[in-house]
Design a protein with these regions (language model features):
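A structural alpha-helix within SAM-dependent methyltransferase catalytic domains
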Residues: 47, 70-73, 132-139, 166
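Conserved catalytic/acceptor-binding region of the Class I
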Residues: 132, 140-219, 243
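Conserved class I S-adenosyl-L-methionine
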Residues: 2-56, 67-71, 88-91, 95
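Class I SAM-dependent methyltransferase SAM/SAH-binding core
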Residues: 57-109, 118, 133
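A short SAM/SAH-binding and catalytic strip from SAM-dependent methyltransferases
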Residues: 118-132, 154
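Conserved Class I S-adenosyl-L-methionine
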Residues: 9-13, 65-67, 185-281
């Protein structure tokens, strides 16, 4: 699978932003159809991590189709959602017309200092060109004493939806496609130490990282295959640029590896993620 470097030049960072924006514009609907059911597993832990209460002002960064913002609103929280992808924001607005959704870059949030009681980001961290800058900007918009929380994936050996695709691509030896940018490793924050250092380095107090593990059912291989291609930006690009024979080989490798998680008719895939949180002093 594609691994990207740890440090980006400004040109590489912009290339990554363009890739992420364009890919998620394209994948917005198919992402929602398949992957929202996966990412919503982290919503309740995130809201608990920031002690979200009724009438809190909450910022949801990398809101995607707006699922976390919608759940927060159901709990009486006043939520604003932002995302780099206009396609995702259009989908979020359509699904949740009563919530304020805006297109915005996490490194340049259009809010005054201390605007929010809490900030959350559900599986956005590994998509940002400069995670340290993104976290700092989130904290800037947070009031003193407010809390911020980020979710990100655990190692692919534990997070098997992405892990199975990653391993199948590597097994076949598929060459990285030219449109995948050089960037940071998407699994940098699968390491608890790296995640903790990110939070502490941003000046947060009581920073902690917790592990969460669950399972996700998928009825058949076709759903897994189409879901991955329709939801995972790097995976979709990596596979989409291969010739037909290589794509067939990747699918065969995926099927063989997924058999370990097929107790009966469908698949039960382990999924694991981390919640990193802290308080603004």
């Amino acid at each position: 699978m594609v691994t990207v470097g740890s440090f980006l030049s400004p040109d590489e960072a912009e290339r990554l932003r363009v890739f992420e924006r364009q890919r998620h514009d394209t994948l917005a609907t198919s992402y929602h159809d398949f992957f929202t059911a996966v990412t919503t597993r982290a919503i309740d832990p995130l809201l608990r991590a920031v002690c979200a209460e009724s009438d809190f002002k909450l910022l949801d960064v990398a809101t995607g189709p707006g699922s976390l913002a919608a759940e927060a609103a159901r709990r009486g929280v006043r939520c604003t959602g932002v995302d780099l992808s206009s396609g995702m924001i259009q989908l979020a607005r359509k699904s949740n017309p009563g919530i304020d959704f805006r297109v915005a870059d996490v490194e340049h949030l259009p809010f005054a200092d201390g605007s929010f009681d809490a900030v959350v980001c559900n599986f956005g961290l590994g998509h940002f060109p400069y995670p340290e800058a993104a976290v700092a900007e989130c904290i800037r918009t947070l009031r003193k004493g407010g809390r911020v929380a980020f979710s990100w994936w655990s190692d692919p050996s534990k997070q098997r939806i992405q892990g199975l695709f990653r391993e199948a691509i590597a097994e076949v030896g598929a060459a990285p496609p030219p449109d995948i940018p050089v960037g940071h490793s998407v699994y940098r924050f699968a390491d608890t130490g790296e995640f903790t250092r990110l939070l502490e380095g941003a000046g947060l107090v009581e920073a902690c990282v917790e592990n969460h593990q669950t399972e996700h059912p998928i009825p058949d291989l076709e759903t897994l295959w189409r879901g991955g291609l329709g939801s995972l930006a790097l995976t979709a690009s990596a596979i989409g640029h291969q010739n037909a024979a290589t794509q067939t080989a990747i699918r065969a490798a995926l099927k063989r590896r997924a058999q370990a998680y097929r107790p009966s008719a469908g698949y039960i895939l382990p999924m694991a993620f981390k919640i990193g949180a802290g308080e603004k002093p």
